[in-house]
Amino acid sequence: RSAESEETYRKEWKEVIDCLYSYPCIGTWVPFNEAWGQFKTQEIAEWTKQYDPSRLVNPASGGNHYTCGDMLDLHHYPGPEMFLYDAQRATVLGEYGGIGLVLKDHLWEPNRNWGYIQFNTSAEATAEYLKYAGILKDMISRGFSAAVYTQTTDVEVEVNGLMTYDRKVIKVDEQKLKKINDSICRSLDK
């Protein structure tokens, strides 16, 4: 990375934080995703934490891992799997899932659609989600802290959303997902 590129990144990263600082829904700053342009990770994570100590810092979601920031974040597709743990930080699965289901007439690009794993019916896609959720629930006792499903909606040529690109059709059984997600959230209740 050139000095000019680094300076631009730092300037723009500060602008992002300044612009979004007052949004209480933001709980974590994530300066890098999947090692795309990742550089001086420890320095950037430390600066971010000093600049806004009120929020968690995820130094690199699914990227090259360093022992800095508040969490260790892995990506694994399609099913959830954790192959690293950190006893000093939250261990999270920043991306998993990608359950593809093509619904004609609700596609951004009808001739190009992709998912990590493809199914033909809502029932099949729901069953796969429930299977993954069961795996997540079992991982909690091993120190697993959080997960982010890819993804809420279809986007452009990716058909792995829980709802279609146009937001008109929910592609899975909402009640079954709510039930399993609630059970995961309550799994640590005594």
Indicate where each model-derived feature is located.
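Surface beta-strand/loop "capping" patches
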Residues: S183-K190
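Substrate-binding/catalytic cleft of secreted carbohydrate-active enzymes
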Residues: R1-K176, I180
